[in-house]
């Protein structure tokens, strides 16, 4: 089950990076009601 564990860690790390990047790049000039990526 090592492959499954590696896959899970990869997905979790990917989503954490997306969340952190989105949080840090959220400038005040952008409307928070819109998620325009």
From Swiss-Prot:
Keywords: Chloroplast, Membrane, Photosynthesis, Photosystem II, Plastid, Reaction center, Thylakoid, Transmembrane, Transmembrane helix. GO terms for biological process: photosynthesis. The chain crosses the membrane at residues 4-24. GO terms for cellular component: chloroplast thylakoid membrane; photosystem II reaction center. It is a single-pass membrane protein. It comes from the Eukaryota. It is found in: Plastid, Chloroplast thylakoid membrane. InterPro entries: PSII_PsbI, PSII_PsbI_sf. Belongs to the PsbI family. One of the components of the core complex of photosystem II (PSII), required for its stability and/or assembly. PSII is a light-driven water:plastoquinone oxidoreductase that uses light energy to abstract electrons from H(2)O, generating O(2) and a proton gradient subsequently used for ATP formation. It consists of a core antenna complex that captures photons, and an electron transfer chain that converts photonic excitation into a charge separation. PSII is composed of 1 copy each of membrane proteins PsbA, PsbB, PsbC, PsbD, PsbE, PsbF, PsbH, PsbI, PsbJ, PsbK, PsbL, PsbM, PsbT, PsbX, PsbY, PsbZ, Psb30/Ycf12, at least 3 peripheral proteins of the oxygen-evolving complex and a large number of cofactors. It forms dimeric complexes. This is Photosystem II reaction center protein I.
């Amino acid at each position: 089950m090592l492959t499954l564990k590696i896959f899970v860690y990869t997905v979790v790390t990917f989503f954490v990076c997306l969340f952190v990047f989105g949080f840090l790049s959220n400038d005040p000039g952008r409307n928070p009601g819109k998620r325009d990526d």
